[in-house]
UniProtKB/Swiss-Prot annotation:
Protein name (Swiss-Prot/TrEMBL): Holin
Quaternary structure annotation from Swiss-Prot or TrEMBL: Homomultimer. Isoform Holin: Interacts with isoform Antiholin; this interaction blocks the holin homomultimerization and delays host cell lysis.
Main localization of the protein described in the UniProt heading: host cell
Pfam family, one: Phage_holin_3_3
Gene: XXXV
TM ranges: 6-26, 40-60, 67-87
Gene source species: Enterobacteria phage PRD1 (Bacteriophage PRD1)
Length: 117
């Protein structure tokens, strides 16, 4: 976990994600042979935001700065939609065991897990 006096060191990771977003946008713009300043700015800002979120999540899991940098850069390059899909799968893997059918609840005869199981 990051210390209170070290938070500023983690600002570099959204910048790395922004570079990833710029590379991704540049690749697409070259393929389409068209460049838009607005799309470029939106891509850069969204990559920085996603990079910050990935950095905060990784710091909460005590990942090393090397892993944080790699994760932030890849998240910026892959884009927000990819990160949302991965995050959604992660959340589903944590929630699904609670929602899976279990033994019959004797109080109301409905299948499903209860908090008493």
């Amino acid at each position: 976990m990051m210390e209170n006096d070290e938070w500023w060191k983690y600002l570099i990771f959204p910048l790395v994600a922004t570079l990833g977003g710029i590379v991704n946008y540049s690749k697409r713009a070259l393929a389409m042979k068209r460049f838009s300043k607005l799309e470029f700015a939106v891509e850069a800002v969204s990559a920085a935001f996603v990079g910050l979120m990935v950095t905060l999540g990784g710091a909460a899991m005590d990942l090393s700065p090397h892993w944080l940098g790699m994760a932030a850069g890849m998240s910026g390059w892959m884009g927000a939609d990819f990160v949302k899909a991965v995050f959604s799968q992660f959340v589903q893997s944590k929630i699904a065991p609670i929602n899976q059918p279990g033994p019959i609840d004797s109080d109301n005869d409905k299948p499903g897990r209860t908090f008493n199981d």
